[in-house]
């Protein structure tokens, strides 16, 4: 499992992370991990019309890690992760006035990923039950960038409003950055 390359797709809400993750997985004929937070928070919203609270963050992070561990067992050379714990950390700090559980930071440093794609905000924001910050996407982009810089990880930024061009850009970056041997 340590030979499997882990690539994280991250960025603010409504930047095409889930679509990018699935498209990259299809392009590279590989497995992917869904965003645990989306399913968890959608269920919370559907059941009680409540949004994410500080108390949810550890469950979200642990759920994401568990999903990754399950999916990697059925993967060969490459796996794409629709967000990871660094996303939860950035979100926590931004939405809860700098608050984060120390476990999030320690795990974000402990867990190793081979490469990150940070999706920029230059695509149209699309509303849904869980998206609530159309005017904070640039702030969230910078929060994600801060976490990636702080972790000193290898990443590139995906830009542009055309989703096909963004996908081609991502494929090119991955081919240049990941050793497939």
Regions found by a protein language model. Give the residues of each.
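Conserved substrate/cofactor phosphate-moiety recognition/catalytic segment
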Residues: 22, 26-65
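A glycine- and Lys/Arg-enriched "phosphate-lid" helix/loop adjacent to the NTP-binding pocket
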Residues: 95-164, 172, 178
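Conserved lysine of the Walker
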Residues: 17
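Hydrophobic anchor at the beta1->P-loop junction of P-loop NTPases
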Residues: 9
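The conserved Walker
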Residues: 13
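Conserved nucleotide-sensing/catalytic segment adjacent to the nucleotide-binding pocket
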Residues: 48-97
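Phosphate-binding P-loop
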Residues: 1-4
């Amino acid at each position: 499992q340590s030979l499997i390359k882990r690539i994280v797709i991250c960025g603010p809400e409504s930047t095409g992370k889930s679509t990018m993750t699935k498209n990259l997985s299809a392009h590279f004929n590989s497995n992917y991990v869904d965003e645990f937070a989306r399913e968890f928070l959608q269920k919370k919203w559907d059941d009680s019309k409540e949004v994410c609270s500080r108390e949810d963050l550890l469950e979200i992070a642990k759920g994401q890690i568990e999903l990754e561990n399950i999916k990697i067992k059925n993967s060969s050379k490459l796996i794409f992760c629709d967000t990871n714990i660094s996303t939860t950390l950035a979100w926590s700090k931004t939405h809860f006035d700098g608050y984060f559980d120390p476990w999030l930071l320690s795990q974000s440093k402990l867990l190793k990923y081979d490469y990150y794609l940070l999706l920029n905000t230059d695509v149209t924001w699309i509303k849904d039950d869980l998206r609530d910050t159309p005017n904070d996407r640039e702030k969230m982009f910078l929060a994600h960038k801060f976490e990636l810089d702080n972790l000193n990880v290898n990443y590139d930024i995906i830009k542009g409003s055309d989703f096909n061009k963004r996908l081609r850009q991502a494929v090119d970056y991955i081919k240049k950055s990941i050793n497939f041997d």
